UniProtKB/Swiss-Prot annotation:
One of its GO terms (biological process) is translation. It comes from Bacteroides thetaiotaomicron (strain ATCC 29148 / DSM 2079 / JCM 5827 / CCUG 10774 / NCTC 10582 / VPI-5482 / E50). Keywords: Ribonucleoprotein, Ribosomal protein, RNA-binding, rRNA-binding. HAMAP family: Ribosomal_uL14. SUPFAM superfamilies: Ribosomal protein L14. InterPro entries: Ribosomal_uL14 (IPR000218), Ribosomal_uL14_bac-type (IPR005745), Ribosomal_uL14_CS (IPR019972), Ribosomal_uL14_sf (IPR036853). GO terms for cellular component: cytosolic large ribosomal subunit. It comes from the Bacteria. This is Large ribosomal subunit protein uL14. The keyword Coiled coil does not apply. The gene is rplN.
């Protein structure tokens, strides 16, 4: 459950470490985003000598949330942190690696996040 001003961990090797949600995409008055949703973020901290600069505005795909997700079979899944991966202008993942597990719900997004992730829960 990500909203404007939420801070997320960036879990790919694009060079960003932390990002701030500045817009939830998908409707005029939409307040919250969950796993599989695309948001607009501002990069808040980066590793040295990365191609992503601090303050850069980018789109991001949410891959983990602390708020639990209800599955159709009635089970729930939640993660320890809120995490995202940065996207380029074409909507593809900017990095080439993903760190940490991702939710199975990302299969519906038709992105290569699931194939890059070390574990899918």
């Amino acid at each position: 459950m990500i909203q404007v001003e939420s801070r997320l961990t960036v879990c790919d090797n694009s060079g960003a470490k932390e990002a701030l949600c500045i817009r939830v995409l998908g409707g005029t008055g939409r307040r919250y985003a969950s796993v599989g949703d695309v948001i607009v973020v501002s990069v808040k901290s980066v590793i040295p000598s990365s191609d992503v600069k601090k303050g850069a505005v980018s789109k991001a795909l949410i891959v983990r949330t602390k708020k639990e997700i209800r599955r159709p079979d009635g089970s729930y899944i939640r993660f320890d942190d809120n995490a995202c991966v940065l996207l380029n202008n074409a909507g593809e993942i900017r990095g080439s690696r993903i760190f940490g597990p991702v939710a199975r719900e990302l299969r519906a997004t038709n992105m290569k996040v699931v194939s890059l992730a070390p574990e899918v829960l």
